[in-house]
């Protein structure tokens, strides 16, 4: 290093053999070099190679020599020259600590083999590129200053701690029109990933909400008031108020940091409660993300599937701007509850594009098929191109942030390294990053098939729905510690959804398997639609879901927090309470949830322990996953005893089907607080004491397997006790009384005393079912009614989520009796022709639910005088008739139009359509009833049993009060 102080220090710049690029960092050829080069210039075996070495390592070598702590550069290169018989030119006058970060060049001359050997010896000590990567991430330009910090303090600290160089775009200083969001991080893989996480934690978190207008003279709250200052200091947030122009009221802005997310959420909730009081729960919270417009389509996915999935999962609304709007064209708005907005924000950030770049040695050849397999299994895009004028290849790996670990895993596989160099420890803490982002094995989007394929980056053929009967062994070949794909049982194919990451599977989860879902990979769009169609889209409603409408995983997690320590059993990852679709073996989850909740930690469903269901398709299980998207509505009392009894019979098909309901469909409304989480006619048949715990308003989607498969299972069921039938009849009587009570005009002189007569029966027209229905109707969200109105087919199909009409026999479990386990399937003498619309039954089995629909009743109970409906109908008005026919949900429609029974008997099919009865099955029921009643009315005066007491409504609407002892209803559809 003495050369630095000599007058010849800058002489290299004017050396005839140097150029402007070399400066002091380039090799300075000595006289000996020139002589040797000149003597052998024309030798055919002579070659010369120029390559870069790591500047920091060379500086460290020179520094150590100057301090007498190691050998000098001169000694190092001289030794190599002697051993390889080559000439080496190197920048001996390299300035230590210079501003330039460029790596200096080394030039080696000699025979080809000698040059190659010398280069390997030099690079073994001074090489950096083989383990150096560059990561380009997307950070909103509006937040660059916040990340950099005052005087660059924030980013300097990150660079020092991670050993990386972080570069923010210089073009943003001068270009006001187009701002770049790209931030580059260069360094070792572990440091680069750590820096990425740290940058995300430095991002600001801003939540906003509108203060309700209490009055014209209401002043804007003072942010300096003691209470607000106390909240601000306690939770380390800043609070400001913005007056809305031309309107009364104000917008509250809460600012915090991403690494303080939990405190920001708590502080915002406290502030809401302080400022809005009882209205706090009804006020939506909003935030916004600045995402480059060119990434919007990529993030939304095909047909918006990605965003829909996030909205349904979190319950937040997400609004992307109109691309034609020049102002704020990059701002994405999120609205919902505090929790849902923060979670949706994290999921969106997890969808931001990420690019990893690194060099590969020129001699390394990679099979294109291997690259294709890596791209599919790791959900990444890989591009390899040769570098001009350099003996190496440039590799570019693209993916999204939630899949970051897999990008390093792809690098490990391509370079043949033993480790990716990145550990899960570099992931953000659970407080700052929700499960599913930094730990992609818990990724909700990938688990629903919404990886890069869903985002539109990869082709449709790469969707990882493996329909072969043998597991894909690629991951095992890459890493022996990786959990294998689930092995199919009994030769049954076991398709899998998107594979979890290699880097994480050894310590987290394995592959999820969904039994009996045989859909080819080309049907991805269809699969996505099915997955999403039946799940209520909370994202479309501004208010947060009512208390009973929280997703089922929230209730499961509430059980986990009761000291049972089963989060690992549910999730396969100890730090994450998030449950992903399809991540848990569907045949045994419910049982394991119960076992774990009862303090039995021996049963867990970690990914490495998952097994396929052991049941045979002949047991009626083929429909187990068909209704993955159908809404469900279990109660949420947390009564694990009842739940255990219901889910633990020996019937695998029922347990599996109900578990799928629990995982996939329970985002429908929990309309009534009752004691059962799941219910099924088959299970209830063996549980008479529990059969009546479920409120009638809690809907169940109909699930009946094929007749041949069900008969053998139902044959041994115990007969129903008569008191259960009487209870069912009593319920219907109460329903009629409730309808009449609501229609009755209040009498001023009458004292009305509240009672609990209707408690728990779900008859209210105001809370909660009707309110939820009106709320969803206002937001164009489909509402699945309590009362079904169509003829249901006994077989199930994928179209059930869109179409509820199936002509034919077999009633679905949406009706009250089926849900309470007293449907036709509970009779001991159940006929073999369950699927037939005209099944015959013995007189002993003709109880209150002996018919599954109107046609069954007509065919099986019509007497010689044809007065069956006449005899069963002893009511006095239209609501009672509709209740008998299972059409109670349409009562309000006719009451609003002031249509009484007499007018109803004159209606035609076209009239019913105009009234809004669009469902074919319901109209057919009504028309058959009209026809039957009119026919009975004509026969009334000819009948010897005609009585003198008639119903109200005029001569044309008179019906006798004759009651048939064997019939409580014309229809089993309540």
From Swiss-Prot:
Residues 1-50, 593-644, 665-719, 783-846 are annotated as: Disordered. Its main location: cytoplasm. The modification Phosphoserine is found at residues 26, 31, 43, 576, 612, 679. The keyword RNA-binding applies. It is found in: Cytoplasm. InterPro entries: BICC1_KH (IPR054727), BICC1_KH-I_rpt1 (IPR047549), BICC1_KH-I_rpt2 (IPR047554), BICC1_KH-I_rpt3 (IPR047553), BICC1_SAM_dom (IPR037974), KH_dom (IPR004087), KH_dom_type_1 (IPR004088), KH_dom_type_1_sf (IPR036612). Residues 132-199, 284-348 form the KH domain. One of its GO terms (biological process) is kidney development. Interacts (via KH domains) with ANKS6 (via SAM domain) in an RNA-dependent manner. Interacts with ANKS3. Putative RNA-binding protein. Acts as a negative regulator of Wnt signaling. May be involved in regulating gene expression during embryonic development. This is Protein bicaudal C homolog 1. It comes from Homo sapiens (Human). The gene is BICC1.
């Amino acid at each position: 290093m003495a050369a630095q102080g000599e007058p010849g220090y800058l002489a290299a710049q004017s050396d005839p053999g140097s150029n402007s690029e070399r400066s002091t960092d380039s090799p300075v050829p000595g006289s000996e070099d020139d002589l040797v080069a000149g003597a052998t210039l024309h030798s055919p075996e002579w070659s010369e190679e120029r390559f870069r070495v790591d500047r920091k390592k060379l500086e460290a070598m020179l520094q150590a020599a100057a301090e007498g702590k190691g050998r000098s550069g001169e000694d190092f290169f001289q030794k190599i020259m002697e051993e390889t018989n080559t000439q080496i030119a190197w920048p001996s006058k390299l300035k230590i600590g210079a501003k330039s970060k460029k790596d200096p060049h080394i030039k080696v001359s000699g025979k080809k083999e000698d040059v190659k050997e010398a280069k390997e010896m030099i690079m073994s000590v001074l090489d950096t590129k083989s383990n150096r990567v560059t990561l380009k991430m997307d950070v909103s330009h509006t937040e660059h200053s916040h990340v950099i910090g005052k005087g660059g303090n924030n980013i300097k600290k990150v660079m020092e701690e991670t050993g990386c160089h972080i570069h923010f775009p210089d073009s943003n200083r001068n270009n006001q029109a187009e701002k770049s969001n790209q931030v580059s991080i260069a360094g070792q893989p572990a440091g680069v990933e750590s820096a990425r996480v740290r940058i995300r934690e430095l991002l600001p978190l801003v939540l906003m909400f509108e203060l309700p207008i209490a009055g014209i003279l209401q002043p804007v709250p003072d942010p300096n008031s003691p209470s607000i200052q106390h909240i601000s200091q306690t939770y380390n947030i800043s609070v400001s108020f913005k007056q809305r122009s031309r309107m009364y009221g104000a917008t509250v802005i809460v600012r915090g940091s991403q690494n303080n997310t939990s405190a920001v959420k708590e502080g915002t909730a406290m502030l809401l409660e302080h400022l809005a009081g009882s209205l706090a729960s009804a006020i939506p919270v909003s935030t916004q993300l600045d995402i480059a417009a060119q990434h919007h389509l990529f993030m939304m996915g095909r047909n918006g599937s990605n965003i829909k999935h996030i909205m349904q999962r979190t319950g937040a609304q997400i609004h992307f701007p109109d691309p034609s709007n020049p102002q704020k064209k990059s701002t994405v708005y999120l609205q919902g509850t505090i929790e849902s907005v923060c979670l949706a924000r994290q999921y969106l950030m997890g969808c931001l594009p990420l690019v990893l770049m690194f060099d590969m040695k020129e001699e390394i050849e990679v099979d294109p098929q291997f690259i294709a397999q890596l791209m599919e299994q790791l959900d990444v895009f890989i591009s390899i191109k040769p570098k001009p004028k350099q003996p190496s290849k440039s590799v570019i790996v693209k993916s999204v942030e939630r899949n970051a670990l897999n990008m390093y895993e792809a690098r490990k596989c391509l370079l043949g390294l033993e480790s990716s160099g990145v550990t899960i420890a570099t992931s953000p803490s659970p407080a700052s990053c929700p499960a599913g982002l930094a730990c992609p094995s818990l990724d909700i989007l990938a688990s629903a098939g919404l990886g890069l394929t869903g985002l539109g980056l990869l082709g449709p053929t790469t969707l990882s729905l493996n329909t072969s009967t043998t597991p894909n062994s690629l991951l095992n070949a890459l890493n022996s510690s990786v959990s294998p794909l689930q092995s199919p049982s009994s030769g049954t194919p076991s398709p899998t959804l998107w594979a979890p990451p290699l880097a994480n599977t050894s310590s987290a989860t394995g592959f999820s398997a969904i039994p009996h879902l045989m859909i080819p990979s080309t049907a991805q769009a269809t699969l996505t639609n099915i997955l999403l169609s039946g799940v209520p889209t909370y994202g479309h409603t501004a208010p947060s879901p009512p208390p009973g409408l929280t997703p089922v995983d929230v209730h499961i997690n509430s059980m986990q927090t009761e000291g049972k320590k089963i989060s690992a059993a549910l999730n396969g990852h100890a730090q994450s309470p998030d449950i992903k679709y399809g991540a848990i073996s569907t045949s045994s989850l419910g049982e394991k949830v119960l076992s774990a909740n009862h303090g039995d930690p021996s049963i867990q469903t970690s990914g490495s322990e998952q097994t396929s269901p052991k049941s045979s398709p002949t047991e009626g299980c083929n429909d187990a996953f068909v209704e993955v998207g159908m809404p469900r509505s279990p109660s949420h009392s947390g009564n694990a005893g009842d739940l255990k009894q219901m889910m633990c019979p020996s019937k695998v098909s029922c347990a599996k089907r109900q578990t799928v309901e629990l995982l996939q469909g329970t985002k429908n409304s929990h309309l009534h607080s009752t004691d059962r989480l799941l219910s099924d006619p088959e299970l209830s048949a063996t549980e008479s004491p529990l059969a009546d715990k479920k409120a009638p308003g809690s809907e169940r989607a109909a699930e009946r397997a094929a007749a041949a498969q069900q008969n053998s299972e139902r044959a041994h069921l115990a007969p129903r006790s008569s008191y259960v039938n009487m209870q069912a009849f009593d319920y219907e009587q109460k329903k009629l009384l409730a309808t009449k009570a609501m229609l009755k005009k209040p009498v001023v002189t009458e004292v009305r005393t509240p009672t609990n007569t209707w408690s728990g029966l779900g008859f209210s027209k105001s809370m909660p079912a009707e309110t939820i229905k009106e709320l969803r109707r206002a937001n164009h969200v489909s509402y699945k009614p309590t009362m079904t109105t169509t003829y249901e087919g006994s077989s199930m199909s994928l179209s059930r989520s869109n179409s509820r009409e199936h002509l034919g026999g077999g009633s679905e479990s949406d009706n009250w009796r089926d849900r309470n386990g007293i449907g036709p399937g509970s009779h001991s003498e159940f006929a073999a022709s369950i699927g037939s619309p005209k099944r015959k039954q013995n007189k002993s089995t003709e109880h209150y639910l002996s018919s599954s629909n109107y046609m069954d009743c007509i065919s099986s109970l019509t007497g010689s005088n044809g007065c069956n409906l006449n005899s069963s109908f002893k009511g006095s008005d239209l609501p009672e008739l509709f209740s008998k026919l299972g059409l109670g949900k349409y009562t309000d429609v006719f009451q609003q139009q002031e249509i009484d029974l007499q007018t109803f008997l004159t209606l035609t099919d076209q009239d019913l359509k105009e009234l809004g009865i669009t469902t074919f099955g319901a109209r057919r029921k009504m028309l058959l009833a009209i026809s039957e009643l009119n026919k009975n009315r004509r026969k009334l005066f000819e009948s010897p049993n005609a009585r003198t007491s008639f119903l109200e409504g005029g001569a044309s609407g008179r019906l006798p009060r004759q009651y048939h002892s064997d019939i409580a209803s014309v229809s089993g559809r309540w």
